[in-house]
């Protein structure tokens, strides 16, 4: 919300285009795959999967920046299985697990495992600056602006 290029004005302009708001990426990706919608904002692996199946879609990463969310994982501080949970996190971050992620068309968090076919290296994708504390603080106001913009 505090970005002059991608903040409130951008969201309000988006709302003027009557976007389809779906509860998940699946319906949006199917809309663009069928040609019912000319563009959609979805997780990148879905576009790669659709293209691999012959759908006439192309993936574009915004030059203004893309969010980077790759298989989030964490350990609850009050977990009774701290050691097991940490071992699982360590596995998820291992070279072997990240190679599996790449094979499943996900962008890895490691730089030594490559990327899915026809996907740029992570270093070549402009990523958004994500201040998680600020995002959390601004969440309610951002949701309100978004809901107002897309429901009018």
Residue ranges of model-derived segments:
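Extracellular/periplasmic bilobal clamshell ligand-binding domains
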Residues: 118-152
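Soluble non-cytosolic domains of exported or imported proteins
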Residues: 5, 22-26, 34, 41, ...
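Ligand-binding pocket segment of bilobal, Venus flytrap-like solute-binding proteins
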Residues: 1-64
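Substrate/cofactor-recognition hotspot
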Residues: 88
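A bilobed periplasmic-binding-protein/Venus flytrap-type ligand-binding module shared by bacterial periplasmic
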Residues: 1-2, 70-81, 100-101
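Solvent-exposed loop/turn segments at secondary-structure junctions
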Residues: 45-48, 64-67, 80, 94-98, ...
